[in-house]
């Protein structure tokens, strides 16, 4: 039996040049990662390499789909509903689409550029194989075809730096203006919701492996050496993706504790430094505290736990999303929620999609998560009977932002599937009454009516007493949605019900209302009222989308828990802007998610100096599509306005006035407060946290010069 290489050995197949690269770039393709896995006795690298070669051969023979189709469930049909078109995957860029929309007779590529790039790379691979004396294969493999050649560090740190077209900073630009979650949590003794509560975020089903007392190797920031050195730290506290760490040797001294996001590449399992020839150096502050650091670490590490060896690999795997720029879909029309519009995916960040309406302007966009019930595949509206705004033919489409971005339609199985419904034994009928979350004011649960029954279990619901009489405020809910409830739900759960116009909340009675309107309530058995053990508790902190301005993600608190329904309060804002969301909503995220994905996080609102603004300028502010403008709570601290502020929101009159006159008196000055913007899906199978491989040979004693 062949002896596995020890941590000091370097496999002979690896060229020496590999060691001269930046060792902090943990994953630089499977070749550079082979020595890491083999050194710890893991066969995952060789398995990945062998399986990758086997998959390539099978793909060439037409037996396996390209990687994006691995996201499909085993029972996924091979044809699209209603159209009969088969799904296809571009062999160059990996984009998923339909065969009829793909290029060439073979339908192997999504565009001419991909076809040419594939051909060029195939020739290079064939020439390289001949130079190396390898036998020719039936089809030369494409060089650098997949995104796996990207470094894991670059992937986690900079998923597109700079700004989006709407001015939203991303990547490193977002992190520079980031909100300090650690200080905020520690100063106020807040508790963050665990990552395991959010089923749509990376590694949600493996976060139980991250526990208090766990040991990791992190960058030593308290050292004066020319090269980057590391030291071992213990997890003192967990808060979402962030952990509070303490260097070994400080023991009970918390003065040098620091927060870190476990998604960064400077946090590693124990043994990583020994494998990668990195030096362990104690912090300069305590370097003289012990004379035998090796013995001290041996005692501290024995029996402890650390991160799984493949932690960062699985993190990257779980942050790959099937939606790509250029995919077309149907999304709710934000100007008229009773219909949908055609849109094109412009940006994908952490599973969140920035959509551009096809017939809109360059800033006519809409943000949502890829699991949002607001988006659907092309043809969905026609199939279920939902209204859709037909795109107008524009003569200047060459200058439209979606021009040259439309590659293919997003296939149906990329969208979150809804629960199957059975209409036998009675179903929803037009005119039935129920309670529903108001889509235009998400903090209210209102008396509502089923206005129309669509196909596939979808319903058009309207709020009783709404301002619209033409049906423009109808909203589409699926029968299994957790945003609709049977009559008396609010009464049974002590939630304030918003009655129709002309009724008082204190005196509203369902029996009298049904009798007066000569209607009947929808049977309770038709509603989806199951409640999982979600783990959310009152007071937990998280990051939540402001659904009235869905491009913004804000610091928020779980204000109330009613079964699976959560009342989300945005820190610093008045309670009238609270929102009801489901515990499995894709619009809530754990602490540190924005930092992990490079998305901008809105901090709690603080007082800012009033900015004089001419009345006529104030009236030009873009009107919000949904809901009311936010009224600010008088804060105790002040903070200067940061450069990242965009789209200021007008503050309401603190005495209760909600509207600003469109024709202000000459000479009046309107004070404007600006809402600050600060930058800061299923996962692989769960792996148990391994015992520590105690290896502390490379410990260097640092001395003061």
From Swiss-Prot:
Residues 15-25, 50-60 have a biased composition (Acidic residues). MBT repeats lie at residues 179-283, 291-391, 397-500, 508-604. One of its GO terms (biological process) is negative regulation of DNA-templated transcription. Residues 1-84, 608-705 are annotated as: Disordered. Gene3D superfamilies: 2.30.30.140, 3.30.60.160. The modification Phosphothreonine is found at residue 76. Residues 38-49 have a biased composition (Low complexity). PROSITE patterns: MBT (PS51079), ZF_FCS (PS51024). There is a cross-link at residues 405, 647, 659, 675, 700 (Glycyl lysine isopeptide (Lys-Gly) (interchain with G-Cter in SUMO2)). The keyword Metal-binding applies. Putative Polycomb group (PcG) protein. PcG proteins maintain the transcriptionally repressive state of genes, probably via a modification of chromatin, rendering it heritably changed in its expressibility. Its association with a chromatin-remodeling complex suggests that it may contribute to prevent expression of genes that trigger the cell into mitosis. Binds to monomethylated and dimethylated 'Lys-20' on histone H4. Binds histone H3 peptides that are monomethylated or dimethylated on 'Lys-4', 'Lys-9' or 'Lys-27'. Part of the E2F6.com-1 complex in G0 phase composed of E2F6, MGA, MAX, TFDP1, CBX3, BAT8, EUHMTASE1, RING1, RNF2, MBLR, BAT8 and YAF2. This is Lethal(3)malignant brain tumor-like protein 2. It comes from Pongo abelii (Sumatran orangutan).
